[in-house]
Amino acid sequence: LRLTGDQLLAMLSALANPHRLRIVAALQKDGRNYVSQLAREVGISRPLLHLHLQKLEEAGLVTSKLELSSDGKALNYFEVAKFEFELTPAAIAQAAKSLTDSGK
C-alpha cells in the first residue's frame, strides 16, 4: 500500500500514543468489540476511549459499525481496519513528496 504523506502522518500520529497502541492490539487479538468491553480491557474510561477511537478511525486504522443487540440496545462495534505498509526511508521520502499544507 502506497500512502500519501498526509495519510502516513495521520497513521503515525494516531499510533504515537500508548493507549491507542493498546487499543489496536486488543482489537487485533480479540477481534471486533464494543466500547464498554474495550474500555474495561484496555483500562481507560469510555469517554477517553471514544477520543482515542475517533483518532484511530480518522487515520483509517479502525472501523466502526452500529448494531442492535438482542435486547434492542445500540452497540457501536469497532475492529481493526485492514492495513499494511512498510516503513522504510524510501517510503518516507516518497510520501513526503505528496504532503499538503495541512500535513506540515
Write out the residue ranges for each language-model feature:
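Long, low-complexity, charged/polar intrinsically disordered regions in eukaryotic proteins
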Residues: 1-6
